[in-house]
Regions:
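Active-site neighborhood of HAD-like aspartate-dependent phosphohydrolases
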Residues: 1-53
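Substrate-recognition element of Asp-dependent hydrolases with the DxDx(T/V) motif
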Residues: 66, 70, 75-116, 134-137
Length: 545
């Protein structure tokens, strides 16, 4: 297999860099700093001598400032997967030797090669791209001729003009790295908006061999045995038995496309923070690689918790107490908010209504989903909002909860993310860790679909949290006002399986043709209905207080 790839805006990412250079070099004023690359280009072209300004800016970005360009998320994984399968990869770029109007004569090609070298493209122990497989062309015709000469099976480019060029080889599959352009149907082009999508398109699922290669690349340890573990809704986990006879957890995170927060960065730094504050019933960090979105941790031996008991609950309370105590440490202030933190009633309502809107956007494909949302969920939600805003303490209705009443939270806390050892529970999964309202932690623990707490356990947990956070005079009132809200929120979370991004990430509809997908979606819808019924019961109890 031979795969050809364009360079600029396909491998190298310049979105932020164009705006930063435009600001520093005086092309734009600070009030335009929120522009993206396309908006910046369009703005400059409308100015006097705008096309010249745009070409000058391109020359600066691709030359003098090339070292500040980013690597496209997911590309490193893709390249390593090619290596595992012995696929030949070629970079073919339309890049002149020097930039337009560049009086300093900076070689654009030399800067591109330096950038690839600094990103370890040519390191045989890492990305392992051959230097001789990088080609620069003076014009588009020469680029297309090189693609034809190489006889690529696939070529990936962000510019449709490459594929519509008269000389483009007809047997080469065309992949446009964009979802914003269209090419006439006779050119038989496939559209993919990110490297994860291209990865899925060409390779399908990540293999154990892929993860073993990544593990060796960042640890310098060989892999004796690797096993993929059952996944939840988040990252992929692998158990690695290494050549040093130690066992590790290799966690493969979603890439950072669409400016998503790095889950790797959040989890790895959070665990390091907890370790530094003497929290021991967690995994330990080993090494991470943000280019590969790969974190390596100590493997935690033990059993999953199928049925919790009172001792488990007490250990969960103790862990929350530890987090609350270290929230007061001086270095805790440098941690960010938990993912989807809810620091006010307005935050919570806004999050739920955004989820409603996302699900409503796909109801043309799912009549049963539309009927549920329109006939059952939304009317109940509207009743809740009208009531709960009056019941919610005014101090955190619209404004954020005061910092002294916030706590550090895993934000996905429960026995589904704990391992039982002989003498203790070890808590895992800190991808969403950060500052939050302890009311959210309390309510999520009770509402999470994996918890299944009975009435007695729920009452014990609720009372323990009220006692723990008793310094907050509004904690109990806020909890009672918000509990139905959080139940409704979970009713929407279980419906994520209807969303296209979930389907793409978990490869449901494209791989299942046996009716199991429809069965699974029906099951999630039934869970959502159960949440609504439970919320109505809980809501009636709140109103009667």
């Amino acid at each position: 297999m031979k795969i050809g790839i364009d360079f600029d805006n396909t491998i190298a990412k310049y979105d932020k860099l164009f705006v930063n250079v435009a600001l520093s070099e005086g092309f734009i004023d600070a009030e335009l700093s929120d522009y993206d690359k396309i908006a910046l280009r369009d703005y400059l072209r409308k100015q006097p001598d705008g096309e010249t300004s745009w070409m000058k800016l391109q020359g600066l970005v691709y030359g003098q400032y090339m070292s500040d360009a980013e690597l496209m998320p997911g590309f490193a994984r893709f390249l390593m997967k090619c290596n595992v399968r012995s696929y030949q990869v070629y970079v073919v770029s339309h890049k002149t030797e020097f930039g337009h109007f560049d009086t300093n004569n900076v070689s654009l090609r030399t800067e591109a090669m330096k950038w690839m070298t600094n990103k370890r493209f040519f390191d045989v122990e890492y990305l392992n791209l051959k230097r001789d497989n990088v080609f620069f062309a003076n014009n588009r015709d020469d680029k297309v001729a090189k693609i034809a000469e190489l006889r690529c099976d696939y070529f990936i480019d962000d510019l449709p003009e490459v594929f519509t060029n008269y000389g483009f080889p007809p047997k080469t599959r065309k992949i446009i790295f964009s979802n914003n352009v269209k090419v006439d149907v006779e050119h038989h082009v496939d559209y993919v908006s990110d490297w994860q999508g291209i990865d899925d398109y060409i390779f399908g699922c990540t293999s154990v061999a892929d993860v073993s290669t990544w593990f060796t690349a960042i640890t310098n340890l060989n892999v004796n045995k690797a096993d993929e573990m059952p996944r939840g809704g988040n990252s992929n986990l692998y158990k690695i038995n290494a050549s040093n006879k130690n066992c590790y957890a290799a966690k493969v995170y979603p890439d950072k496309s669409d400016n998503r927060t790095s889950r790797l960065q959040k989890e790895y730094r959070s665990i390091e923070f907890l370790q530094a504050n003497n929290v021991t019933n967690i995994p330990t960090t080993v090494i991470s690689d943000e280019v590969l979105d790969l974190g390596i941790y100590s493997w935690v031996n033990g059993e999953i918790i199928e049925k919790s008991d009172l001792d488990d609950l007490k250990q969960a309370v103790d862990f929350v107490q530890k987090l609350y105590d270290i929230s007061k440490s001086s270095n805790a202030k440098y941690l960010g908010c938990a993912t989807e933190a809810c620091l006010s009633a307005n935050d919570l309502v806004t999050q739920v209504e955004k989820r409603i809107d996302k699900l409503m956007s796909v109801t043309t494909q799912y009549d049963v989903l539309k009927h549920f949302l329109v006939d059952q969920f939304i009317p109940l939600w509207q009743d809740l909002v009208e009531y709960a805003f009056d019941e919610w303490p005014s101090s955190s209705r619209d404004d954020d909860l005061k910092v002294e009443y916030q706590t550090l939270s895993p934000s996905d806390f429960g026995f589904h993310n704990a391992i039982r050892q002989s003498d203790r529970l070890v808590f895992v999964d800190f991808e969403y860790f950060g500052w939050d309202d302890p009311v959210k932690l309390t309510a999520d623990f009770m509402w999470h679909p994996a918890m299944n707490l009975d009435v007695e356990d729920s009452l014990y947990w609720e009372k323990s949290m009220i006692d723990l956070f008793s310094s907050d005079p509004d904690f109990e009132q806020r909890l009672h006002a918000s509990k139905p809200f959080y139940g409704m929120r979970w009713g929407l979370i279980v419906l994520n399986r209807f969303l296209p991004e979930f389907i793409a990430n978990h490869k449901l509809s494209v791989t299942k043709h046996d009716g199991s997908e429809e069965y699974e979606l029906d099951g999630q819808l039934e869970k959502a209905k159960n949440y609504c019924n439970a919320v109505m019961e809980d809501f009636s109890q709140v109103v009667s207080r």
